């Protein structure tokens, strides 16, 4: 993707690196250079740290050391989580590109037999995305009235989905606490839809996303596993929810806290478009592999919700595009429609889709191809807004 950037000059690099013995004049120059590039010393240092971890990960791949691959994959992901929120808010498009390549690396590294070629390829792309970040600058452009209105409209959509999420989670956790497994299965899928439509918003709000949506292997050693997927495992795998009342209560508490945070949320047009791209990346990277809903197998429910959330963004910015970029809006209209037609083949009723484990490799590839095409077209919005 081609985003507006400013290159970091050699003088700027020297200013950033010359920390020891710097006098007041050099400190002033360093600050000016940082402001000019838009990227702080802390971000540059964090990028350098990630590049070091990537190199060590690739060394482990070369040696075929599966334990070390898993360890470095987790370390890379954990380090990114330590500063990603600052990147998400100030550099949303660069953030999305980094996520697009980091997610498959992390997923692959956790496998018993990781694909070495895939890790290497994605690592190179990740390093390029990190380099783009170090050369990025914050947008100084004031949003047009149309785009500002679009951001407000999307915030209204997010609030509505969050409100429905609270209600659906109340019903779901109530079923869990009553011990009704079959009812819990039905209500689990309904609640997931509302969460997946606004997932990037939840991810931007600190620790709430891992509390609500972490899978078991995402939880750091010593941390407590909570949220939807802990209950999913109890319902489908263990088939015993008698001991999950505390988990249900915590999930509802966290979802309500998320809803409260969303009420005061401020969003820019850049952030909402990046969020739409992130949703499509999420669908194409984790949902399409069946990694997300490993016990319930409702991955297609999540996947469709991601696409619906992305389309909601598109519909809010469409009016700002249609006059000068009608070719792009027509293409997106067609591609969203085609994807919905394709997904309709797998719909079993108003609320559900075919279980992921019933799909053939050919069907999964077809869905993946459509998602990739849609994601690439959606990314063009970033260039024209």
Swiss-Prot record:
Q: How does the protein associate with the membrane?
A: Lipid-anchor
Q: Does the keyword Transcription apply?
A: no
Asked whether the UniProt record includes Transport among its keywords, one would answer: yes
Question: An example of a Gene Ontology BP annotation on this entry?
Answer: iron ion transport
Q: Belongs to which family?
A: Belongs to the EfeM/EfeO family.
Quaternary structure, per UniProt, is:
Component of the iron transporter efeUOB/M complex composed of EfeU, EfeM and EfeB; EfeU is essential for the complex formation.
Its domain comment says:
The peptidase M75 domain contains 2 metal binding sites, site III and site IV. Lacks the N-terminal Cup-like domain present in EfeO proteins that contains metal binding sites I and II.
Q: What is this protein called?
A: Iron uptake system component EfeM
Natural source organism: Bacillus subtilis (strain 168)
Q: Which gene encodes it?
A: efeM
């Amino acid at each position: 993707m081609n985003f507006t950037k400013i290159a970091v000059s050699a003088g700027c690099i020297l200013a950033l690196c010359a920390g020891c013995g710097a006098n007041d004049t050099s400190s002033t120059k360093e600050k000016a250079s940082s402001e000019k590039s838009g990227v702080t010393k802390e971000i540059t240092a964090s990028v350098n740290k990630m590049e070091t971890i990537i190199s060590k990960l690739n060394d482990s791949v070369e040696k075929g050391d599966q334990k070390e691959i898993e360890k470095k994959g987790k370390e890379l992901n954990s380090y990114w989580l330590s500063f990603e929120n600052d990147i998400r808010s100030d550099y949303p498009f660069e953030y999305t590109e980094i996520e697009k390549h980091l997610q498959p690396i992390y997923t692959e590294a956790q496998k018993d037999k990781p694909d070495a070629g895939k890790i290497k390829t994605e690592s190179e792309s990740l390093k390029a995305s990190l380099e783009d970040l170090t050369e990025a600058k914050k947008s100084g452009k004031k949003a047009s009235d149309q785009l500002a209105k679009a951001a407000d409209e999307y915030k209204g959509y997010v609030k509505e989905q969050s409100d429905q999420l609270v209600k659906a989670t109340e019903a779901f956790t109530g079923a869990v606490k009553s011990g009704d497994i079959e009812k819990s299965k039905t209500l689990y899928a309904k609640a997931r839809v509302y969460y997946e439509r606004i997932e990037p918003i939840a991810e931007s709000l600190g620790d709430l996303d891992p509390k609500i949506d972490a899978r078991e292997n995402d939880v750091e050693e010593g941390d407590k596993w909570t949220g939807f997927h802990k209950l999913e495992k109890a319902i489908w795998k263990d088939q015993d929810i008698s001991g999950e009342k505390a988990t249900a209560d915590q999930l509802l508490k966290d979802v309500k806290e998320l809803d409260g945070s969303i009420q005061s949320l401020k969003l820019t047009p850049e952030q909402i478009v990046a969020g739409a791209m992130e949703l499509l990346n999420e669908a194409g990277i984790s949902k399409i592999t069946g990694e997300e809903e490993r016990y319930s197998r409702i991955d297609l429910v999540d996947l469709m919700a991601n696409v619906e959330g992305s389309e909601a963004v598109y519909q809010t910015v469409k009016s700002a595009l249609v006059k000068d970029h009608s070719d792009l809006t027509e293409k997106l209209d067609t591609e969203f429609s085609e994807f919905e037609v394709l997904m309709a083949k797998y719909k079993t009723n108003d609320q559900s889709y075919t279980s992921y484990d019933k799909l053939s490799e050919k069907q999964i590839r077809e869905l993946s191809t459509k998602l990739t095409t849609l994601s690439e077209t959606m990314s063009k919005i970033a260039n024209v807004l």
